Amino acid sequence: MKADIHPQYHETTVTCTCGSTFTTRSTKENGAISAEVCSQCHPFYTGKQKILDVGGRVEKFERRFGRRQPGQKVGGAK
């Protein structure tokens, strides 16, 4: 195996938006990573239903394109 071709691992603290933190190792040099979800708040691990709508994606889509009514046709052919 060649020497000095692999990146250096650094101790890194991962901080979730829920406030929990844990330490791991990473090639990222500044030693800090932020995460949106972790095992403490992810619905799969907690067993609780929670909507993870980051940045209001649904609302942004509805503002941009509007909400269609049933039976309403989409724009005509050109």
Swiss-Prot record:
It holds the Pfam family Ribosomal_L31. Its cofactor is Zn(2+). GO terms for biological process: translation. Keywords: Metal-binding, Ribonucleoprotein, Ribosomal protein, RNA-binding, rRNA-binding, Zinc. InterPro entries: Ribosomal_bL28/bL31-like_sf, Ribosomal_bL31, Ribosomal_bL31_A, Ribosomal_bL31_sf. Binds 1 zinc ion per subunit. Disulfide bonds: none annotated. Zn(2+) binds at residues 16, 18, 38, 41. It comes from the Bacteria. Part of the 50S ribosomal subunit. Binds the 23S rRNA. This is Large ribosomal subunit protein bL31. The gene is rpmE.
